[in-house]
Amino acid sequence: MQMLDRLESEILADRVSEESRRWLASCGLTVEQMKNQMDPVYTPARKIHLYHCDHRGLPLALISTEGATAWCAEYDEWGNLLSDENPHHLQQLIRLPGQQYDEESGLYYNRHRYYDPLLGRYITQDPIGLKGGWNFYQYPLNPVINVDPQGLVDINLYPESDLIHSVADEINIPGVFTIGGHGTPTSIESATRSIMTAKDLAYLIKFDGNYKDGMTVWLFSCNTGKGQNSFAS
């Protein structure tokens, strides 16, 4: 049986070994005779479909090259499938940016961890620890606007969807510990829009691997220096 399985694989790959040919010859058979006895392998015709996504990148429909809707679905804010129409039995596993539906678990694989849309949370902790904020399992608090393509958050506190996030990434001042984020006179926002106090931010700075005791800290954030006893002070 093992020999037949191997022979079948070799014939399908069109790479029959000399050993297999000798074995067939000893049985009075040829490769062509065996090939004619095998059931044809069904290979579906390849078809191109174009994605139609919402403003977050969540696929809502697959459009054929003829302009027909081959698949469509409706989701809630957290990515839960509410309904779908799939007359051609297409396999569409892509969800929110960076996510792929796992049929076995019902969860969404998000590169570094799994996201549960029913809970609106990750099921494992953020692998970058406190740099992602206090809540290790949190998904963006406003999923209508924000996404988390990698399942990670950077020390750069500007959301990745904001243009200023990439600008802040370019700030590199030797010997200075720099922080960027949206702020107010009394607080600063994390990358997931949660509010952080001065004490919260100080804790993150202290445990950041790039921070050394005595370093100058520069805060690139609007409004955090306004008024007396401001957040920046």
Swiss-Prot record:
Belongs to the RHS family. The lineage of its organism: Bacteria, Pseudomonadati, Pseudomonadota, Gammaproteobacteria, Enterobacterales. It comes from the Bacteria. This is Putative uncharacterized protein YibJ. It comes from Escherichia coli (strain K12).
